[in-house]
Amino acid sequence: MSVAPIDFQQVEKRYDDKLVVDGLSFHVQPGECFGLLGPNGAGKTTTLKMLLGITHPDAGSISLCGEPVPSRARHARQRVGVVPQFDNLDPDFTVRENLLVFARYFGLTAHAARALVPPLLEFAKLESKADAKVGELSGGMKRRLTLARALVNDPDVLVLDEPTTGLDPQARHLMWERLRSLLARGKTILLTTHFMEEAERLCHRLCVIEEGRKIAEGAPRMLIEAEIGCDVIEIYGPDPVQLRDELAPFAERTEISGETLFCYVDNPEPIHARLKGRTGLRYLHRPANLEDVFLRLTGREMLD
């Protein structure tokens, strides 16, 4: 059996008196895209810092690429590429120079580093921007350059922290296509994201954490079927509490978030009949998705 590229076992981390990671366990299989989801403050960033050996756990065990962390984190990181949440590209360098300089951090010779640049530029679709300064790039181009830079050491594992935050839909879809191509090449990916569509499209499995604890784990479709299992009618109106009292008898379950009432239904027709022709209301009937799972598990929207 091959060694899991990432393995967390009963990991804990405290800051002062607050337990920010509480007995967290998960593992990532070779060639898998594994998502780590949770609201702000759930412990995702601390988890990534412990994985990379930047922060030391107070209890539990961590291994990365078969190496114990933090004791051999430096060795493990030689086989890891990291895309941070915020771009840390060098603005004084060109696109090409950013790749060349970063390659030298991994001990590559100047000749080997120069040989890497053309295929990385092609991968990032930045061939025409090789000699442009970072400040001349769009947000999507910067994210693709950061991803290309993370590949200079041909890593086995990629750790991506919010890889498409701040990108427009077109740039986000291009980033997803690049990530899928890496999975097709056998790379292992751990990613945090606030975008449920992103998690559903990319992740083979995911783990939802809240207050440092794992509250669900599994394939996206499995979680949707287990936690929701039916269609959803979203109703937008001025008095969701009154609407809930009226429509609850015709739904399997109802939830309110802001001014929106969510009705989870096996048969939508009774609710459709009662909403038809009403003024001041908007509603949408759709299949259940990961956003519904998140709301169900945490009681909060993802972006809080």
Swiss-Prot record:
One of its GO terms (molecular function) is ATP hydrolysis activity. The keyword Translocase applies. One of its GO terms (cellular component) is plasma membrane. PROSITE patterns: ABC_TRANSPORTER_1, ABC_TRANSPORTER_2, NODI. It is a peripheral membrane protein. It holds the Pfam family ABC_tran. ATP binds at residues 38-45. It is found in: Cell inner membrane. Residues 6-236 form the ABC transporter domain. The complex is composed of two ATP-binding proteins (NodI) and two transmembrane proteins (NodJ). Belongs to the ABC transporter superfamily. Lipooligosaccharide exporter (TC 3.A.1.102) family. This is Nod factor export ATP-binding protein I.
